[in-house]
Curated annotation (Swiss-Prot):
Protein name listed in UniProt: F1 capsule antigen
Top-level taxon: Bacteria
Signal peptide annotation: 1-21
TM annotation in the entry: none
Cell compartments where the protein resides: Secreted, Capsule
Amino acid sequence: MKKISSVIAIALFGTIATANAADLTASTTATATLVEPARITLTYKEGAPITIMDNGNIDTELLVGTLTLGGYKTGTTSTSVNFTDAAGDPMYLTFTSQDGNNHQFTTKVIGKDSRDFDISPKVNGENLVGDDVVLATGSQDFFVRSIGSKGGKLAAGKYTDAVTVTVSNQ
């Protein structure tokens, strides 16, 4: 009888131990936020007509037009912006006449921020001045200003340039 009672005791203790070993659970909600990539925009507004001087050139610092860049991330700096064109002249954009005579003039691209510092983006890989300024929130105007004829006299007519912008670190 002693042998049977010890077997029964072991069976009862095993059942008690199993009953007290409950499974514990915890839960949480995992989330992830997805944002759309920056979608930059570039628009151009032509300035007032420019008068050709008697020598066939144009004055410097005349407003040719305004490039407005938008859609970049807050905190983007001026040297993160690179305007390019087919001529590829470092620091300058080249406008070409549409009369078929290939008259050209060059421009620089600058801006002003609220602190009245020059904002100098890269143009064809190089910037005109060394200031690296945080761009305005939302959009930034860049002023396209004349430098002068690119060899030879200019003729009256429409001048154009196909400008592409790349903004780094977006």
